[in-house]
Amino acid sequence: MPSYIDGQLAGAWGQGARLYASGPWAQGLPSQGYQLALNPAQLYRTCIGAVRRELAARGLDFPEAPAEARDAFLREVEEGRVDCGGFSSAVFFETLLANTVEGFFSDPSYGGNRDMAGWRMIGFPGAYAAYLQLYTHHGMRFDREPTAMGDAAARRHPHDHPGGRAGEHRHG
């Protein structure tokens, strides 16, 4: 998941390209969505630093701590009880959870869903290019291995290239 999240934070979303960033910064309602003066990359940097400081202050080595202690600390972050420098740790937790779920179920080309594990878990077939013959067959089993966008492009089906064979390039 780190590769997926790092990619998102380095891109337009992480830099807040589509976020209104001119204030004023009043406390918003949950229905109003993201209401911080930080872009997502800044939120991650700020809150990860705050979480690390809080763990150090408690003498808690997160990876080595018992599962119960890790769960209890994550619950505190989720409930907004960890100070993130004036920002709610709940917003950070919500963002981190959403990015983790996105990465787990995204196409592997985005850096998450290694070996299509998320898709295999739920039985999602992935990015097959041609469902035309199947879309009216409701309730039909579809027992194929998942395929990613990159896999579909590499297969080069004949129906994608009229007059040619799979894998054959035609130059005019």
Please describe what each predicted stretch is.
Residues 1-172:
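Mature-region segments of soluble proteins
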